[in-house]
């Protein structure tokens, strides 16, 4: 194995190149990263495995990158103006999914350039576009690349034109590589060395240190490991540092780089990317996007661009067995170490017991969090239907923010505001009609449409977030045979006619099934839930009405028939009045039972009723 000159730090900034890869799910970003690792020989052949940087099982299984990873690599360009010089590449692998835009924006802050990676058989997708615009806003140097040119279905000419049209470059400038065979990858790295600017430091290496945190992970043995990009100054082990957003002080126990495993080093200088370990066990003290500086004589101004990510979707998570409640709390706290954007607070439900109300960035984030809780911590969970945050103004002018249907104020409401999103959908031309129909059925308002090429169309809509968090994505995929891609971003709020629909069992509301829906679809929701519960709840000894209500007005009803014992079996050929006496007696018993009995709802019924259907 060649000696890794990238393993020594305090490199001259002019020899450093920081870049990230922007790509859609499945466009081959992790495979390309694998090839780059092999070419630079930092991973020995025997240790190489596919998707080397995706550490979590769930990342490999779903083929997506969730956490930003970083690697420091040596590269000696074989062509171009830096031929033969030792260049240190720092690659930051970013998530490509819409829910993780904040993770992407922080990773972009740590770079000077980006490789825009597009599948040569599929063309650019909506989320890639969103991340590309984010990179352009940050003034990053963009290197357009078509991947998977070894595929028989690849059409590099067509998509090179499409990319050139979007970025405003010449089609010939779009590089062609194959992450699988490695073709074109060395040329790509030479281009990175040539085109991406070296990091610049605003105040130089002798100024007070300023470093931006772009990720933090929790290590069971060493506490929180914080990944940083140095902007100014130097950090060395045993220094005392302060986190500017939280104002906490720590001692640096270890400073190091990832190449591609963690290696201790003597310290980090301007432009370098590495990690710090301070022995902190509580991740709330290391916020992603925060600025780290020296505790004494530190920098006065933090780096700009730090924002607390706001949850957009809320859902209740309840353990199936109540004994797991403390474990669920521990698990959520551990996940929060890794995931700054996850928020949670305890919640009790009459039907489901104790649990947590959790806030997520979006649906994928919610699904992955739940998956990780079940897989990494072995918990069995029920999650309630997702909801968003509504701003409710009561008749007396009092305002409240509601993100749980059970907190919905009673009485008359003056107005209700719901969050809306601006959505971009890219679909093949033949599916435009059915996609527009779907968006209109979800109360979407069209903002415009553009042809990206002769057979791909970009549609822009403004839609209520509450309508898309449930099953919009699945419906869109099924209507477009899986060819559509979408991206959404927050766009404020709008007035809406929303009501809370309660589901009553035997006259008592069950909080887990309550939902906030638009008045026009309240009837549909009521009918759907009552029918579903009628099939799921086993028959009781007495008749149970399942009703849907808005306030005190019942809008839908189904009955679960009572189980009856045959009381006439012992009455041989007797008189009708004898039979009637027995039936009346049974009826009176059932009536008494109904007034005092409670309905037992099995756990499975909750799980099934709360899971979304393909309706």
From Swiss-Prot:
Cellular localisation: Cell membrane
Keywords: Cell membrane, GTP-binding, Hydrolase, Membrane, Nucleotide-binding, Protein biosynthesis
Residues that span the membrane, as ranges: none
GO MF term set: GTP binding; GTPase activity; ribosome binding; translation elongation factor activity
Record-listed E.C. numbers: 3.6.5.n1
Annotated ranges, domain tr-type G: 14-200
GO cellular component: plasma membrane
Catalysed reactions, semicolon-separated: GTP + H2O = GDP + phosphate + H(+)
Broad EC category: hydrolase
Main subcellular location: membrane
Membrane topology: Peripheral membrane protein
Disulphide bridges: none
Stored SMART domains: EFG_C
Residues given in the record as GTP binding sites: 26-31, 147-150
GO biological process: positive regulation of translation
Family (UniProt): Belongs to the TRAFAC class translation factor GTPase superfamily. Classic translation factor GTPase family. LepA subfamily.
Function: Required for accurate and efficient protein synthesis under certain stress conditions. May act as a fidelity factor of the translation reaction, by catalyzing a one-codon backward translocation of tRNAs on improperly translocated ribosomes. Back-translocation proceeds from a post-translocation (POST) complex to a pre-translocation (PRE) complex, thus giving elongation factor G a second chance to translocate the tRNAs correctly. Binds to ribosomes in a GTP-dependent manner.
HAMAP family per record: LepA
NCBIfam families named in the record: lepA (TIGR01393), small_GTP (TIGR00231)
Protein name, UniProt field: Elongation factor 4
């Amino acid at each position: 194995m060649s000696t890794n000159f990238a393993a020594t730090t305090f490199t001259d900034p002019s020899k450093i190149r920081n870049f990230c890869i922007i790509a859609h799910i499945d466009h081959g970003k992790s495979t390309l990263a694998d090839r780059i690792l092999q070419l630079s020989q930092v991973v020995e052949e025997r240790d190489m495995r596919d998707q080397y940087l995706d550490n979590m099982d769930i990342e490999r299984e779903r083929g997506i990158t969730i956490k930003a990873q970083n690697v420091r690599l040596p590269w000696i360009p074989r062509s171009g103006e830096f031929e033969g010089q030792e260049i240190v590449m720092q690659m930051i692998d970013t998530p490509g999914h819409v829910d993780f835009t904040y993770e992407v924006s922080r990773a972009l802050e740590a770079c000077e350039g980006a490789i825009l990676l597009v599948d040569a058989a599929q063309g650019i997708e909506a989320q890639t576009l969103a991340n590309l615009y984010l990179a352009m806003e940050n003034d990053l140097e963009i290197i357009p690349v078509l991947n998977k040119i070894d595929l028989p279905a690849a059409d590099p000419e067509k998509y090179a034109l499409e990319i050139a049209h979007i970025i405003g470059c010449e089609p010939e400038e779009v590089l062609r590589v194959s992450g699988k065979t490695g073709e074109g990858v060395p040329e790509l790295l030479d281009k990175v060395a040539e085109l991406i600017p070296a990091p610049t430091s605003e105040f130089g290496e002798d100024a007070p240190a300023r470093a931006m945190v772009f990720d933090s992970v929790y290590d069971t043995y060493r506490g929180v490991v914080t990944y940083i990009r140095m902007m100014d100054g130097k950090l060395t082990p045993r220094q005392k540092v302060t986190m500017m957003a939280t104002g906490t002080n720590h001692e640096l126990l270890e400073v190091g780089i990832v190449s591609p495993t963690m290696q201790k080093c003597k310290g980090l200088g301007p432009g370098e990317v590495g990690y710090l370990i301070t022995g902190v066990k509580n991740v709330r003290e290391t916020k992603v996007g925060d600025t780290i500086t020296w505790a004494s004589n530190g920098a006065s101004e933090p780096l700009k661009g730090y924002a607390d990510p706001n949850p957009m979707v809320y859902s209740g998570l309840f353990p199936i067995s109540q004994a797991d409640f403390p474990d669920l709390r521990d698990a959520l706290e551990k996940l929060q170490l890794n995931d700054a954007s996850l928020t949670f607070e305890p919640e009790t439900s009459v039907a489901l017991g104790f649990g947590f109300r959790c806030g997520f960035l979006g649906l994928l984030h919610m699904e992955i969090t739940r998956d990780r809780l079940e897989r990494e911590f072995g918990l069995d969970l029920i999650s309630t239907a997702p909801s968003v945050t509504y701003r409710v103004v009561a008749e007396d002018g009092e305002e409240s923010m509601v993100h749980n249907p059970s907190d919905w104020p009673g009485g008359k409401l003056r107005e209700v505001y719901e969050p809306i999103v601006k959505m971009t959908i890219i679909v093949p031309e033949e599916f435009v009609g059915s996609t527009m129909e779907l968006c209109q059925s979800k109360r979407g308002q069209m903002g415009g449409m553009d042809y990206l090429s002769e057979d791909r169309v970009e549609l822009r809509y403004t839609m209520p977030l509450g309508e898309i968090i449930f099953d919009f994505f699945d419906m869109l995929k099924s209507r477009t045979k899986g060819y559509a891609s979408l991206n959404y971003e927050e766009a404020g709020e709008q007035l809406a006619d929303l009501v809370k629909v309660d589901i009553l069992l035997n006259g008592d509301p069950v909080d887990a099934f309550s939902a906030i829906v638009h008045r026009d679809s309240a009837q549909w929701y009521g009918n759907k839930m009552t029918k579903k519960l009628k099939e799921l709840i086993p028959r009781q000894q007495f008749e149970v009405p399942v009703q849907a209500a808005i306030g005190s007005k019942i809008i839908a009803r189904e009955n679960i028939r009572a189980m009856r014992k045959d009381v006439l079996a012992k009455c041989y050929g007797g008189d009708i009045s004898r039979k009637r006496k027995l039936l009346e007696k049974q009826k009176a018993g059932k009536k008494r039972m109904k007034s005092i009995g409670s309905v037992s709802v099995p756990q499975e019924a909750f799980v099934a009723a709360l899971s979304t259907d393909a309706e």
